[in-house]
């Protein structure tokens, strides 16, 4: 079966077929050629397929989750977020608490794990999770 790509614009309209059959563009509807018959044009119309694309999703919600979703918008259902002190690096960036936790040592908050529990869902990954006090 030959694949074809057709352009419908002001006359003449061209149809490009796959290289296996005919690599040259052929007239789909000829403007000044009276030798082609209506049967040939109808056959070409019936064998060619057109595809249309339809947008099914749009980026209306900047947080990335549905507005009525149970999934936590802060952690996106993971239950943990990047550590706010080390920015996900696992080590202290500066000295903390009068030098008790030195820069370059394991992070004092996440202890080198690079992630901490989400504060919005308490690590559950969904709104109304474990020990949550948020009610609507």
UniProtKB/Swiss-Prot annotation:
Coiled-coil segments: none
Residues where Zn(2+) 2 binds: 83, 86, 107, 110
Protein name as annotated: Protein BUNDLE SHEATH DEFECTIVE 2, chloroplastic
Keywords assigned: Chaperone, Chloroplast, Metal-binding, Plastid, Repeat, Transit peptide, Zinc, Zinc-finger
GO cellular component entries: chloroplast; chloroplast stroma; cytosol; protein folding chaperone complex
Function noted in UniProt: Chloroplast chaperone required for RuBisCo biogenesis and translational regulation of the RuBisCo large subunit (RbcL). Stabilizes an end-state assembly intermediate of eight RbcL subunits until the small subunits (RBCSs) become available to produce a complete stable RuBisCo complex containing eight small and eight large subunits.
SUPFAM superfamilies reported for this sequence: DnaJ/Hsp40 cysteine-rich domain (SSF57938)
Keyword Ubl conjugation: no
């Amino acid at each position: 079966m030959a694949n074809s790509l057709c352009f419908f614009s002001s006359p003449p309209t061209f149809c490009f077929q796959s290289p296996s059959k005919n690599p040259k563009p052929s007239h789909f509807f000829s403007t000044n050629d009276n030798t082609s018959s209506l049967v040939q044009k109808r056959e070409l119309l019936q064998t060619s397929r057109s595809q249309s694309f339809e947008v099914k999703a749009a980026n209306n919600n900047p947080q990335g989750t549905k507005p009525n979703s149970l999934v936590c918008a802060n952690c996106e259902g993971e239950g943990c977020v990047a550590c706010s002190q080390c920015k996900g690096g696992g080590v202290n960036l500066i000295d903390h608490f009068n030098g008790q936790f030195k820069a370059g040592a394991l992070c004092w908050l996440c202890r080198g794990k690079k992630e901490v529990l989400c504060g919005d869902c308490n690590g559950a990954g969904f709104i109304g999770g474990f020990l949550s006090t948020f009610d609507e």
